[in-house]
Amino acid sequence: MASMKESDFYYGAVISTLINNKICPALVESGKDRQIYEFTTDQGDFKLFLKYRSAPKTKNEDGYRSWQFNFTESDLKRLCQYIEENKHLSVGLVCGENKLGNSMYTVLHKEEVRLLLGAGKESVTVSIKKSEKKFRIEVGGGRKKAMMIPTSRNF
């Protein structure tokens, strides 16, 4: 019997969500820390670059939970390539929790990815406060100056 990897649960949850919304993927590239999917929809083609963290890195007294996503040199090269080729690109970051049912994901669109790459970021910290409906993506200057990404955003 084939065994499943931890990443199968996280990537599978995102793919299941998309399929339930009538969006069918084709796997383009698979690796230990990321997966890249290509989608064809009635609104056009797009690439989805997925990464996950299985648990938050911190839970502090301010009520924030944070996940840090590191990008390898290969990841950054691939993202830059997609942007240069003017591909429709989304980056999905799966924010796992110890109770899998409490896990969430956020989606960065190409313009936001371009901003992060332009800032020389090799990692992205995603945080959310307990009662908020937006993720914070730190670009520089801490949480107060962070990009605010709605939790209900589509790919």
Tell where the protein language model's regions lie, with residue ranges.
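Short loop/turn segments at secondary-structure transitions that flank enzyme active sites
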Residues: 54, 97-99, 114
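Non-catalytic C-terminal interaction segments of nucleic acid-processing enzymes
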Residues: 103-155
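Acidic-basic catalytic patches of nuclease active cores, encompassing PD-(D/E)XK
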Residues: 1-44, 56
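Short secondary-structure capping micro-motifs at structural edges
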Residues: 33-37, 70-83, 93-94
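Electrostatic, structured charged patches in enzyme active sites and in nucleic-acid/phosphate-binding
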Residues: 71, 76, 84-89, 103, ...
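Conserved catalytic cores of phosphodiester-cleaving nucleases, focusing on short active-site segments
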Residues: 37-72
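Nucleic-acid nuclease catalytic cores
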Residues: 81-108
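Positively charged, aromatic-accented nucleic-acid-binding surfaces
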Residues: 10, 20-27, 31, 79, ...
